[in-house]
Amino acid sequence: MNKEGKHQLVAEVHDKLQRAKAVFLADFRGMNVGQATDLRNELRKADVEYKVIKNTLLELASKGTDKEALNPYFAGPTAVAISYDDPVAAAKVLSRFAKEQTNPFTLKAGVLSGKAISPADIQALADLPSREVLIAKMLGSMQAPATNFVGVLAAVPGSFVRALNAIRIKKEGN
């Protein structure tokens, strides 16, 4: 790749890093083409971009972004997974892939909200429920008091009607 191509690639990756919510680095040594293709497809389904880029170009591209915390991890073969939407989904796919593979595919580090996170932190992130599940749980807990209140309001007239019905039955019996 010529110098102009490298400048263009650095600018493109810089823009992607600025837009990303999370970035994860992995050592892909020992992966064959089929495994890499499978990983790319799984990540694509989770709206995550997966690329292999030279460390020096990644380091240049990360300058001026909150992803500079990854600079110490740019050593050896490095693949980068860029998540623009849901960091948990990306962490789930990468962690599952690392567990399932017999080759030494390992997570190096990641960055979330401008802070570097370790492979253990990535695993903890992967263990979280998905965004949709968390939102559903939050909405359920917010909705519970209102549902209980409506139940109480509905019980008062119902109790009144049952009391009137009992009085009517008692009077009809006399």
Swiss-Prot record:
GO function terms (MF aspect): large ribosomal subunit rRNA binding; structural constituent of ribosome
InterPro entries reported for this sequence: Ribosomal_uL10 (IPR001790), Ribosomal_uL10-like_sf (IPR043141), Ribosomal_uL10_bac (IPR022973), Ribosomal_uL10_bac_type (IPR047865), Ribosomal_uL10_CS_bac (IPR002363)
Keyword RNA-binding applies: yes
Keyword check for RNA-binding: yes
Listed Pfam families: Ribosomal_L10
Keywords: Ribonucleoprotein, Ribosomal protein, RNA-binding, rRNA-binding
Record-level GO BP terms: translation
GO cellular component entries: large ribosomal subunit
Record SUPFAM superfamilies: Ribosomal protein L10-like (SSF160369)
Free-text function comment from the UniProt entry: Forms part of the ribosomal stalk, playing a central role in the interaction of the ribosome with GTP-bound translation factors.
Family designation: Belongs to the universal ribosomal protein uL10 family.
Subunit architecture: Part of the ribosomal stalk of the 50S ribosomal subunit. The N-terminus interacts with L11 and the large rRNA to form the base of the stalk. The C-terminus forms an elongated spine to which L12 dimers bind in a sequential fashion forming a multimeric L10(L12)X complex.
Name of this protein: Large ribosomal subunit protein uL10
Organism this protein belongs to: Geotalea uraniireducens (strain Rf4) (Geobacter uraniireducens)
